Amino acid sequence: MTSKLEQLKQYTTVVADTGDFDAIARLKPVDATTNPSLLLKAAALPRYAEHLRRATAGSGGDAGLACDRFAVAVGKDILGVIPGRISTEVDARLSFDSEATLARAHRLVELYEEQGVGRERVLIKIASTWEGIRAAEILEREGIQTNLTLLFSFAQAAACADAGVFLISPFVGRIYDWYRKSENRDYVGAEDPGVRSVSRIYRYYKANGYKTVVMGASFRNLGQIEQLAGCDRLTISPDLLQQLADSQGELPRLLLPGDGEPRQVLDESAFRWQMNEDAMATEKLAEGIRLFARDQEKLEYQLATRH
């Protein structure tokens, strides 16, 4: 019998959630995603020392530019061993500023193009705030496709679909974490709140004819991945990808299009109200932005203090 990883690839596009070039080359995903936390880990790997040096040398003392140059250098390397696309993230500190997000997205695309990488192989990752979604809407019209991340609520998913974004990344594991702590209980299988959230979004998109890709993210265990077999894409850490590759047994498609809710079009006030009413989404979005911003600052400091 083929491994569970190979079976999953029959239903779902598998994406590697890492900046580890060697792991990507070994596990052979279609696409790859990075974020400030993963880039901070990548910066500690010996193979990226030269990228760090060049990023710093070419940035004129601008630590933010150095981070973008490093992210693009890592992304270009990864694109050499995958057939698909790399997701590169805008500075999380810009999550509530549409204009600044647009400017940073344009810079990332320009840096990739300077390296001979066309925009068709890049997704710009942006936090799923109201301001981030509005910036993504403009980028999509410009032919720059986006990956809306830190997505925890149905309101965020509905707004992203209405804006015509290319792809969303709902965070399964972080939703699970919040409910496990809040309710003081464990969840397995289809009752997992993170699994239920992604399943609801997937069926809503399919029922209403949205083309936005649903890419489940942030997994804590194989059970969550198995429940979402059939999702458009799943971005998975190297450790869990390896566990799937080492696992035998049948992996059926469990997520199928089905009855979805009627289409919702949310204006800003409705979006903000629905977010306000969802304590989990409000807390996890804020926490996620803070964590990514913290790791961005750590990476900037590391680049600024290189000798």
Curated annotation (Swiss-Prot):
Instruction: Fetch the SUPFAM superfamilies from UniProt.
Output: Aldolase (SSF51569)
Q: Name one Pfam family in it.
A: TAL_FSA
Keywords recorded for this protein, A-Z: Cytoplasm, Pentose shunt, Schiff base, Transferase
Q: Which domain of life is it from?
A: Bacteria
Q: Does the keyword Cytoplasm apply?
A: yes
Q: Which GO terms describe its molecular function?
A: transaldolase activity
Name the EC number(s). 2.2.1.2
Q: In which pathway does it act?
A: Carbohydrate degradation; pentose phosphate pathway; D-glyceraldehyde 3-phosphate and beta-D-fructose 6-phosphate from D-ribose 5-phosphate and D-xylulose 5-phosphate (non-oxidative stage): step 2/3
State the GO CC annotations. Answer: cytosol
Q: Tell me, which GO biological process terms does this entry list?
A: carbohydrate metabolic process; pentose-phosphate shunt
Q: Where is the active site?
A: 125 (schiff-base intermediate with substrate)
Which locations, inside or outside the cell, does it occupy? Cytoplasm
* HAMAP family in the record: Transaldolase_1
Q: What does this protein do?
A: Transaldolase is important for the balance of metabolites in the pentose-phosphate pathway.
Q: Which family does it belong to?
A: Belongs to the transaldolase family. Type 1 subfamily.
Q: What is this protein called?
A: Transaldolase
Organism lineage reads as:
Bacteria, Pseudomonadati, Pseudomonadota, Gammaproteobacteria, Pseudomonadales
Q: Which gene encodes it?
A: tal
